[in-house]
Amino acid sequence: GLQGSNDNFDLERLEVLGDSFIKYAVAEYLFLKYPLEHEGTLSQQRSRFISNKTLYSLGKLKNIPEKIQSIILNPKINGILPGFVLKPEIELHLQNIKAPSDTWARYANVTEEQFKEEIKKMEDGGRKSCYNPWTQHEVSDKSVADSVEALIGISLLVGGRETAMNFLGNLGMEIYNGTSFQCSLPVPSALLSKEEWANEEVLRYYDKYCLDRLEEKIQYTFRDKSFIVQATTHSSFCQNKVTDCYQRLEFLGDAILDYLVTGMVFSSHVHCTPGQMSDLRSYYVKNETLARAAVKKNLQCHLLYLAPKLQASIDKFISLFQNGLDDDDEIFTEDDAVDLEDVEVPKALGDLIEAIIGAVYLDSGKSLQRAWDVVQVLMGDIIEETMKKKDIPMNCVRKLYEMVPTGIRFDKLPFQEDDGKAMYKLEIPGLPPLIRSGKNYDVAKIVAAKAGLRLLKEKEERGF
């Protein structure tokens, strides 16, 4: 049932759960199916698998739109009398003249000329949907895709991962051909060479960079040390010739973390609205939160990189963190920093945690329980602190609209070709216009929203 059906329940919470599962299932499949593809290609392929267009097409083939409850079930408004049938010639005539569905019931009460005149007026107002209101309903493509995700979510709840995978197979999604997770593709080694020297080199890196201490911090001992070496190797660390960098593991770990966190939020916040669930999930998996978790466990000292700019960014973030950075402080990432006063959150720290989660998952034989144990070790205190808070953290753009419900306006400005920056203009009632830039328009909008929140906070502190 859609939210518009005004029933006691709807699909939206299940949709959030199903969305995270399909993202995880497809990410694992692509990671194992294409061991030589880099993270960018895998992300593009995953987007094709899980897009609303794909889910809509699969749902339509299975006649799911016919099963959706999209309107209020009210006999006085849309009920049909027993034995009532619209004559085929009347239905064909109404369709030919493109009569909007909410006018069909009045056809017998007016003359043909009056009815056509009424239709013309409604068309001028943009009302053009024409269908039989007693035997058909109007459902958007996205609603069909959302329903498919909700069905995946309920399959997961009722029967677990295997049932959800079987449902994906029955839908026609080409991952594992509908077979079991346990019978899926083998896990490849992280080593780039099968020669004996490669194993020796991995152990040398393991000892040289004290990765045994990292294992102690995450409370997991790797059986295949090549996974932990890969998980800690930044793309700038060209000295490592035996494994790839962590980007592929980060792609997998991101999906696993999203799935595990969504499941935790779904089960522990039963009274949360779908919007609040999404806010919580976004808060737990965003780069700021992961960077805080990494610094709390001092994981940055195990990151292998050769990038002075990244070193400066990490040092600056650690300094701020040690000086008592508050969780509510607005922080800018490397991608959206606009001046020296903005605090940079090194994306590599969040990527490191995601790569470690992906590495643990593979090394443990694709055990979600082991991966969740590591998540709890790294982020358990952050999750516990958030649960104690009265207010649920939310996206900065949404938070801005919550604080100022009316009058806010975001305007895109022309792309700056000279420095490759996208720009957004933000207007808030009672404040001067703000112009902020970023590497793309999505980032620029977030930067502008964060700047607006800071101004509102300063205004409130001054008592205006």
Predicted regions and their residues:
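Double-stranded RNA-binding/processing signature
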Residues: 1-464
